[in-house]
């Protein structure tokens, strides 16, 4: 699969295009009287060094673009790469099955866990079917049903957050979007099993929080977590979405800032160039963090889990 490069990655894209061109020539005529392999190797090293240099100094807006990268791994990619025996469960038992939320039982190193996450979709038809990862109330009610099932069977809950936000359509509001989100916040704070949440892409507002109340909250290195998109913030404060880069910096949407504010617990490093460059390596790092988190939580009693979660929530907003 060829990589899609973002605007700030154009110098890397140019180098990679040269590498691809030389590689194609080499395949067409193996009798060329020049050492193409040596030149390709030199360019690859230069590309890696350039990538390292660019990614060492990314701003919040550039990270926001990476969080939305169309080739970035989604929930079902991590399910495939890091878990075994996934059985998807569907429907909220009241209205419909929202494809923007996926969930089911799987095994993490042999241990049964409940997985719940946003799913955006790749191709146009799938994006529409999954509503671009923006859940309706039935999606959050499905998530709550699966959480309650996990509690009943004493299974840890693992959530993957990747949404621009809850769907703001008229139908969603009529079916109780705000109530569904609020109920999830309340019920997640009361769950008697370990809950580990990880932001894998965009963590957009209440749509993210509705599956984001946990004992451990992680973020991938190039993910974002915010109350509104940078474009939305810029439109409100500066009356222009063009100010999105300025808004992104001011909002503190990136993992290091959120860890500094004690809103998250861990930052999971991504492969050089982002998770989409090496999904397998990213999944391995994510899996290792999940296993570490569950080991830390396994020693706590049900009451300890609830009390710690309550104290965590009550600490928000204090300097």
UniProtKB/Swiss-Prot annotation:
Principal subcellular localisation of the protein: cytoplasm
PANTHER family named among the record's database cross-references: ACETYL-COENZYME A CARBOXYLASE CARBOXYL TRANSFERASE SUBUNIT ALPHA, ACETYL-COENZYME A CARBOXYLASE CARBOXYL TRANSFERASE SUBUNIT ALPHA, CHLOROPLASTIC
The record's function comment reads: Component of the acetyl coenzyme A carboxylase (ACC) complex. First, biotin carboxylase catalyzes the carboxylation of biotin on its carrier protein (BCCP) and then the CO(2) group is transferred by the carboxyltransferase to acetyl-CoA to form malonyl-CoA.
Gene Ontology cellular component list: acetyl-CoA carboxylase complex
Instruction: Keyword check for Heme, yes or no.
Output: no
The entry describes its oligomerization and partners as: Acetyl-CoA carboxylase is a heterohexamer composed of biotin carboxyl carrier protein (AccB), biotin carboxylase (AccC) and two subunits each of ACCase subunit alpha (AccA) and ACCase subunit beta (AccD).
Lineage, top-rank taxon, reads Bacteria
Q: Please, one GO biological process term?
A: malonyl-CoA biosynthetic process
- What keywords are annotated for this sequence in UniProt? ATP-binding, Cytoplasm, Fatty acid biosynthesis, Fatty acid metabolism, Lipid biosynthesis, Lipid metabolism, Nucleotide-binding, Transferase
Q: Name it.
A: Acetyl-coenzyme A carboxylase carboxyl transferase subunit alpha
Question: Which ranges carry the CoA carboxyltransferase C-terminal domain?
Answer: 35-296
Listed under catalytic activity are: N(6)-carboxybiotinyl-L-lysyl-[protein] + acetyl-CoA = N(6)-biotinyl-L-lysyl-[protein] + malonyl-CoA
Q: In which pathway does it act?
A: Lipid metabolism; malonyl-CoA biosynthesis; malonyl-CoA from acetyl-CoA: step 1/1
Record Gene3D superfamilies = 2-enoyl-CoA Hydratase, Chain A, domain 1
GO terms assigned for molecular function: acetyl-CoA carboxylase activity; ATP binding; carboxyl- or carbamoyltransferase activity
Subcellular location(s): the record lists: Cytoplasm
State the EC number(s): 2.1.3.15
Q: What is the lineage of its organism?
A: Bacteria, Pseudomonadati, Pseudomonadota, Gammaproteobacteria, Enterobacterales
Q: Which family does it belong to?
A: Belongs to the AccA family.
